[in-house]
Amino acid sequence: MAQVINTNSLSLLTQNNLNKSQSSLSSAIERLSSGLRINSAKDDAAGQAIANRFTSNIKGLTQASRNANDGISIAQTTEGALNEINNNLQRVRELSVQATNGTNSDSDLKSIQDEIQQRLEEIDRVSNQTQFNGVKVLSQDNQMKIQVGANDGETITIDLQKIDVKSLGLDGFNVNGPKEATVGDLKSSFKNVTGYDTYAAGADKYRVDINSGAVVTDAAAPDKVYVNAANGQLTTDDAENNTAVDLFKTTKSTAGTAEAKAIAGAIKGGKEGDTFDYKGVTFTIDTKTGDDGNGKVSTTINGEKVTLTVADIATGATDVNAATLQSSKNVYTSVVNGQFTFDDKTKNESAKLSDLEANNAVKGESKITVNGAEYTANATGDKITLAGKTMFIDKTASGVSTLINEDAAAAKKSTANPLASIDSALSKVDAVRSSLGAIQNRFDSAITNLGNTVTNLNSARSRIEDADYATEVSNMSKAQILQQAGTSVLAQANQVPQNVLSLLR
């Protein structure tokens, strides 16, 4: 090897190896501090891509497991509501068995049918109001897809069915034939129902609108009814006249009234600024014109100044008999409380049902209009008639409420085979509950499988991207030793060119 000083090959070789060990040491320290074998794509490009796909699957499957739990909750919510529907159906069946017994009176059958109707209405309420996160689960047929995988199409479908009285085939279910109609039935079963209740207070008769509660007289041309503000009596006047106060009138009085002479006498005998009382009112003498009694006095009523003017007393008159009196404002006495007011009338409030009752009004029959026909209801509202015949409420085959008279009702029979109808409804509810129970078990299985898959994927990803501390500690120790050795050897290599100097001596 030639002896040169410009290029130190041994030093360069040593530096290169030292850089390699430095890089190895940095990599080992980075992995040990992060716990990851792959901290960037350069560490393992293929491994990073594989681990990233594992991460996507793990996150997707973890969310899918939560979705499956939501699916279980939906099924449990629906099944719980169906359990209540089942309980109501069981009670309806029990009542139906009771109703088929020949020992029941008409009153017994009516009571049984009333409870059956309440149970059926509760079934409809449960159907309409049961929901999960805003989704009604029993009010319509619906298929709800639950994503239980990390990829498209990996779903489980929950079949939700409409379960209500109509879908169960119990619409119009009756063990006692058509039900005698009441006012409440008319209001709840039909739209745009109008009419009025009649009331009598002595010889006076009134109507109360069944919708607005407005009270009018019971006449061909009804008048609106009010409550007298003074005495609480019923009246058709919308206001009551307040009593004018003679002392305070804007029109000039005739000469020599008691009020005019009294005020004139006070002015004549006093001076400006003096006060005096008259009829319970305190006045102040504002102006005194001469010594004859002419002038002005004032008082304050309800925060406003009212001035009385005395005039027409001749100069030098020895008495005040010619005095006239005029007020700046008309003042009245309220019929309600007897206090001064500037209003000539007090408004009456519109009458309400409670006002009729306060005046001992007695309820009479009602007139109810449904679909253009006017029906008559008795005072208690539990009997509806038309042309002298009692009306019954019935339902058509399509479930639409209708009114029929007693003749048509007599020809109607109770629901045929009521127990078979209930059993059919129970079977349908059982089928839906069984389906929901099976879907819950399926979700449980899916959740278990998802958990196992996530565990295995985490293990696989760990083998790719997690650091092996035993290996990395060994690599770090090796790199540290190589660093120390390389540094020492580099010092020796840098001394090699010094040997050339011996040739120059």
From Swiss-Prot:
Q: Name the major location.
A: secreted
InterPro entries linked to this entry: Flagellin, Flagellin_C, Flagellin_C_sub2, Flagellin_N
Q: Where in the cell is it found?
A: Secreted; Bacterial flagellum
Its domain of life reads: Bacteria
Give the Gene3D superfamilies listed for this entry. Answer: 6.10.280.190, f41 fragment of flagellin, C-terminal domain, f41 fragment of flagellin, middle domain, f41 fragment of flagellin, N-terminal domain, Flagellar export chaperone, C-terminal domain
Q: One Gene Ontology cellular component annotation? A: bacterial-type flagellum
Which controlled-vocabulary keywords does the entry list?
Answer: Bacterial flagellum, Secreted
Single annotated GO MF: structural molecule activity
Other remarks on this protein: Individual Salmonella serotypes usually alternate between the production of 2 antigenic forms of flagella, termed phase 1 and phase 2, each specified by separate structural genes.
Role noted for this protein: Flagellin is the subunit protein which polymerizes to form the filaments of bacterial flagella.
Q: Tell me which family the UniProt entry assigns to this protein.
A: Belongs to the bacterial flagellin family.
Tell me what this protein is called: Flagellin
Q: To which species is this protein native?
A: Salmonella enteritidis
Per the record, the gene is fliC
